[in-house]
Amino acid sequence: MDFTNLKNTDPELLDMIKKEEERQEYNIELIASENFTSLSVMESMGSLLTNKYAEGYPHKRYYGGCEFVDEVEDLARERLKKLFAAEHANVQPHSGSQANMAVYMSVLQTGDTILGMDLSHGGHLTHGSPVNFSGKLYNFISYGVDKETETIDYEKLKKIALENRPKMIVSGASAYPRIIDFQKIREICDEIDAYMMVDMAHIAGLVATGLHPSPVPYADFVTTTTHKTLRGPRGGAILCKEKYAKAVDKAIFPGIQGGPLMHTIAAKAVCFGEALREDYKEYMQQVVKNTKVLGEELKNYGFRLISGGTDNHLLLIDLTNKNITGKDAEKLLDSVGITVNKNTIPFETLSPFITSGIRIGTPAVTTRGFKEEEMKKIAYFMNYSIEHREENLSQIKEQIKEICKKYPLYQNA
């Protein structure tokens, strides 16, 4: 991208951006929640739309001069509704966390009981963690995975729901590698007359392309981020049934946010448009293929995959048998140019700052053009680095850099 002005006005900051650019260019990015946006997304975010205040919603603003940003937001909403066959869409949430907060506030009262997935079993901070607003403002109880299969125990979920009769059941996850049965969860919600909310932040791209069953027909509310598998700007969005539209919109503004970020909403419109194209479906299909191959190769090297494998874009790996913690593995792999994140595993025995596992995903490397052969090489690099962690790994680092050079991030930037 062109940084001519920044070069003249703030070379100190530009130097930091350039260092991060180099890190992204020459590292294999395996953090499951990260991706690389298109140049079109970045251009939209860097546009003069950032100058415009637009409190309210299209055609009902609290400021003048909003006729063109109204068009932008309308475009984003219509594309998002089309992408997921939804009745109503709100594209103003600044993040997935704020999207979740708005849904809770739209129909619940402080202190109401909500059933959500345990964070250490693959849930998310905003699904009831005691250190998060969700756990502080609401009475969250949790469900998790079966100890043997390491997949969601729907019977136990139902039992907990019947015993506690929560006002809402939240599903969706940040570290769960299997298909989620939204129909089953809907049936449980109906049995206890509870709202159903799905946080599909991680799997939105899979849902959009039919590679994971859609929660939209079943859920009252669906939240997502726009920067993971959707490959857009950092931000959030909410889909809901038409009957909840006013309550959701009111919860976002004036409930928890003021002015929307119109430059980000423009970038969301771009990414929704990209996700409606056929080449995006091919991309997501390759993500799933890559993840399966990477998982099988790692299993061949003796890594234990939580639940035995994957149905989506990510893998959760128990490193106990490799005699290394998630924290140490993250640091080690980072030193050779592979970026992962430490992650708790179900029935974790270590601190969340240490962890027994790591979480990896293929959306970012697939965006670069990596395919099955590269997945085999990544598995080799990971295994070799961990098995030979006391040795000099400069050769591995160099090989990783060479692969990255073959698949440059932005060829025409």
Curated annotation (Swiss-Prot):
Annotated site residues (Plays an important role in substrate specificity) in this chain: 227
Pfam families in the record: SHMT
Official protein name in the record: Serine hydroxymethyltransferase
HAMAP family tied to this protein: SHMT (MF_00051)
UniProt subunit comment: Homodimer.
Gene from which this protein is expressed: glyA
Superkingdom classification of source: Bacteria
GO cellular component: cytoplasm; cytosol
Transmembrane segments: none
Function as written in the Swiss-Prot or TrEMBL entry: Catalyzes the reversible interconversion of serine and glycine with tetrahydrofolate (THF) serving as the one-carbon carrier. This reaction serves as the major source of one-carbon groups required for the biosynthesis of purines, thymidylate, methionine, and other important biomolecules. Also exhibits THF-independent aldolase activity toward beta-hydroxyamino acids, producing glycine and aldehydes, via a retro-aldol mechanism.
